[in-house]
From Swiss-Prot:
Name by which UniProt lists this protein: Small ribosomal subunit protein uS7
Function, in words: One of the primary rRNA binding proteins, it binds directly to 16S rRNA where it nucleates assembly of the head domain of the 30S subunit. Is located at the subunit interface close to the decoding center, probably blocks exit of the E-site tRNA.
An example Gene Ontology CC term for this record: small ribosomal subunit
Binding partners and assembly: Part of the 30S ribosomal subunit. Contacts proteins S9 and S11.
Organism: Oceanobacillus iheyensis (strain DSM 14371 / CIP 107618 / JCM 11309 / KCTC 3954 / HTE831)
Keywords linked to the UniProt accession: Ribonucleoprotein, Ribosomal protein, RNA-binding, rRNA-binding, tRNA-binding
Pfam families: Ribosomal_S7
Gene expressing this chain: rpsG
Top-rank taxon, per record: Bacteria
One GO term (biological process): translation
PROSITE patterns: RIBOSOMAL_S7
Family listed: Belongs to the universal ribosomal protein uS7 family.
Single GO MF descriptor: tRNA binding
């Protein structure tokens, strides 16, 4: 805990091309070693591929993918009487978004396609169709929360 009170949240600026803060946060998630230009290029090319393959607006497909990937529940470890319990808790809206973006980018990196643009585009398309590794990760989180529902009364 900082002594000087809570640290203020930094607000991200909306993306110049898509006018969306969510897109800026995705660019920040893709970015490695501060190379924002490269991350933007990857995302914009991926969005072009998404629009081409789906025949829809890339932004709408991405928003649908985010809805399908963002977890509602997660489990957190809580120590009670010498043993650790996995306690299911609801995920705050901002964390839901952060986790969704992280899952999409991380599982894109693990895919087998040649370029990051293709991997990201395919992961977004898969997520919008409720398939893919990122959606599976969310389902696994929900299953864990469901399995540990008995410990819900340990919430804090």
């Amino acid at each position: 805990m900082p002594r000087k009170g809570p640290v203020p949240k930094r607000d991200v600026l909306p993306d110049p091309l898509y006018k969306s803060k969510l897109v800026t946060r995705l660019i920040n998630q893709i970015m490695v070693d501060g190379k924002r230009g490269k991350a933007q290029k990857i995302l914009y090319n991926a969005f072009e591929l998404v629009a081409e393959r789906s025949g829809q607006n890339a932004m709408e497909v991405f928003e649908q993918a985010m809805k399908n990937v963002m977890p509602v529940l997660e489990v957190r470890a809580r120590r009670v009487g010498g043993s650790n319990y996995q306690v299911p808790v609801e995920v705050r809206p901002e964390r839901r978004q952060a986790l969704g973006l992280r899952y999409i980018v991380n599982y894109s990196r693990l895919r087998g396609e040649k370029t990051m643009e293709e991997r990201l585009a395919n992961e977004i398309l898969d997520a919008s169709n409720n398939t893919g590794a990122a959606v599976k990760r969310r389902e696994d989180m929900h299953k864990m929360a469901e399995a540990n529902k008995a410990f819900a009364h340990y919430r804090w």
